[in-house]
């Protein structure tokens, strides 16, 4: 009162709007719009047109679909929304390389999937990254009502991340699509890539000498996925010089098969690490669609 500060009455505009305050305290989306509109009007003296977005952040367009960019727990987040979502709101999440070799993503959008990116690119599937991914997953269910069974997509190092996340969250996964995936950190980045290797040690909070006992590679921990019969589709080039197939995808395929896990392999002849995916991704998309809950 002494400072003659303006008081904005938000009670009167929201009176008799019980449906917009489900817990009688916190507003839902419509209630938040009413509050924001009233505050804006008092501060500026103007009314303003508004749009209720499906997701937070900056809205733009990606390949003809609505795209939303925002941060969650300090990490870049992108959600691309289908024109007509399928019942249950299925979604595919990749933690690395948004928009790269995205033919399968584009076809899934056309079929009614949400395409989601949450950036864990440079975390090497470490425990903290797995925890961040789980918190992000929970936010997508709680706030946006996406399906509790997510499809995971991992290209290259992203494959390491999605496999490790799935191992710790088997009940949350519909199926996995991995493409030229890193499955063994000793193969890629390997000790020869010294800067990246130091980064691996930092992310995993390990000393060099402790790596002798390292058991964090997904190919050493596939049993929970196999027991759950979690479907995996694996796309690889047989001439991959960056993430060698024989040291990564082949071991994943052989071990998962030996455990009775369902896995489909598409091995591209004379293909290096790039290009990822397939020119016609129908076989990938059909596999994902048939393995939804």
Where are the language model's segments positioned?
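A domain-start/cap signature at the N-terminus of enzymes
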Residues: 48-87, 195-199
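Alpha/beta-hydrolase active-site loop
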Residues: 124-145
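Alpha/beta-hydrolase fold nucleophile elbow
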Residues: 144-156
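The feature captures the conserved acid-bearing segment of alpha/beta-hydrolase catalytic domains
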Residues: 198-250, 254-257
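Hydrolase active-site cap/lid region
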Residues: 164-210
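Catalytic His-Asp segment of secreted/periplasmic serine-dependent ester chemistry enzymes
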Residues: 1-48
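Glycine-rich nucleophile elbow surrounding the catalytic serine of serine-hydrolase chemistry
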Residues: 154-164
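C-terminal catalytic histidine-bearing segment of alpha/beta-hydrolase fold enzymes
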Residues: 80, 242, 246-293
